[in-house]
Amino acid sequence: MINVNCLNNIAACGLKLFSDEYNTESSFEDAQAVLVRSAKMHDMELSDNLLAIARAGAGVNNIPLDKCAEEGIVVFNTPGANANAVKGQVIAAMLLASRDLIGGNKWVADNAEDPDIAKATEKAKKAFAGQEIKGKKLGVIGLGAIGQLVANAAIALGMEVYGYDPYVSVKAAWNLSSEVKYISDVKDIYKECNYITVHVPALDSTKGMINKEAFDLMQDGTVIINCARDVLVDEAAIGEALKSGRVKTYVSDFPNPTTAKMEGAIVLPHLGASTAEAEDNCAIMAVNELRNFIENGNIVNSVNYPNCDCGVCATKGRITVCHKNVPTVISKITTVLGAAGINISSMANQSRGDYAYSLLDIEASAPEAVVEELSAIEGVIKVRVIK
């Protein structure tokens, strides 16, 4: 029985994909696999039983990635599973910032008891007049799964779209509309665009990237949209930019005591991925990733170990090894198997930074003594027998 712990509520359509060999009611301490959404794991003690963690979503700043890698715990996320939901919110954010729909709705609520509200509306509506987004310039910082959908949708709405991403993948580039103008210097986004939306992970290099220096380059009346991570925007700097008029509206999906009181900000309660469809997609993708890893040893969409997919094992045995990305480890693994008279039918090895992953299909079952010998190799972190 494989024990699975859910640190947050996970959509039932995902959990039902587990076979009867899985117990999804396990405690965290006994779990071999964990499903998580937003629960903070940095202070949690990770047991020796734990093999994998799957984040039902894209961001993984709530998971201790380095600690997990050191202990041979593979961490997965679900890139793209909630992208359409976030795209929809970004489009809505642009409309909310352009047309004072919130103010108009509040006026109606405040005057709901007025018997002449219909007549009063014709005079009052002038206060809520806005502008269209068609023909305006949108800068998209980050062209991953979400950014590319936002860019393409904005093109369809008649906007002039500029995209910036120094690490854009070939796949993302192929999916991007040819009408998107690719920008090599993010400063040009700040200078040119009326609307700017950011879609990058929270890294040391991106924290506070939308700062005073960025605002100084922008046109007056710029709209900033942040449905990615709260730390990407320097809140003190954007507060000043709102007061000066450099920024017309800041739409944030991350309420806190600062943004909640910020005049000129539209702050939403972290709704970007909160659609039934997105939660279902994330749960299904996360469960499939866990099952593929537990049952086949394959790694797809890991954030701390390299991807390594050899399909379903067709030989008598399969061994997986999490290890340091250092010389001689591979040769020592093959030497141990050779000395035990075990032939390697096929082998895959991939590396990612300081860590590597090896998957070996063998023509005989590996006895416990061989597993112990493999585990004793310097640089080896975790050995697992799939079959």
Residue locations for each model-derived region?
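Rossmann-like adenosine-cofactor binding region
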Residues: A39-M44, P166-T259, S274
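An N-terminal-biased, well-structured beta-alpha scaffold segment characteristic
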Residues: M1-T78, N211-E213, L217, V223, ...
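Oxidoreductase and adenylate-handling cofactor-binding alpha/beta cores
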Residues: K87-K106, N152-M159, M285-N298, T334-G338, ...
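Phosphate-binding beta-alpha-beta segment of Rossmann-like dinucleotide-binding domains, i.e.
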Residues: P79-K137, N301-V303
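Glycine-rich Rossmann-fold phosphate-binding loop(s) that bind the pyrophosphate
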Residues: L143-G144
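N-terminal Rossmann-fold NAD(P) dinucleotide-binding loop
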Residues: G147-Q148
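NAD(P)-dependent dehydrogenase/reductase Rossmann-like domain
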Residues: E263, L271-K387
